[in-house]
Design a protein with these regions (language model features):
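Glycine-rich phosphate/adenosyl-contacting loop at the front of the ribokinase-like
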Residues: 1-67, 72-76, 82-86, 139
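Ribokinase/PfkB-type carbohydrate-kinase core domain
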Residues: 2-17, 75, 79-93, 97, ...
Length: 147
């Protein structure tokens, strides 16, 4: 599918939204080992969010359904999606749970270990999807992940 085909379709992504906290290290720690890392950075992430952003950057018309916490990570994600031109009408905020985060350690060979705290992602409920019924019905393509 080329970008012309993508721009003509209504694409709906249902999925996760995380903040990736990445630290680079010489090697991955073994159980019980504490090591000193190098560079640390944070990126928006989550398989669903990554798909939605990629589609938007290819010129697609994309709506994203997800749930974030009503914390700084959730607010930053919402802002990023809006800047990317993603329809955020169904980015739900959960005041009772934090946004999802992924703690990622990457070694010199680009091997990684990832621990995900799903947070509000785990509380995306059928009742939330019911609120997005119109967007679901209008979608030409629906993407979902197993994260």
């Amino acid at each position: 599918m080329d970008t012309t085909q993508i721009s003509r379709r209504q694409i709906l992504v249902v999925g996760s939204c995380n903040t990736d906290m990445v630290i680079k290290a010489a090697h991955l720690p073994r159980p019980g080992e504490t090591i000193l890392g190098g560079t640390f950075f944070m990126n928006p992430g989550g398989k669903g969010a990554n798909q939605a952003v990629a589609i938007a950057r290819l010129g697609g018309s994309v709506t994203f359904i997800c749930k974030t916490g009503s914390d700084i990570f959730g607010h930053q994600s919402q802002q990023l999606f809006e800047e990317e031109g993603i329809n955020t009408s169904y980015v739900f905020s959960d005041s009772g749970n934090p946004s999802g985060v992924a703690l990622i350690t990457v070694d010199e060979k680009a091997e990684n270990c990832i621990v995900v705290a799903s947070g509000a992602n785990a509380n995306l409920l059928p009742s939330d999807l019911a609120k997005a019924e119109e967007a679901i019905e209008l979608a030409d393509l629906i993407l979902m992940q197993l994260e």
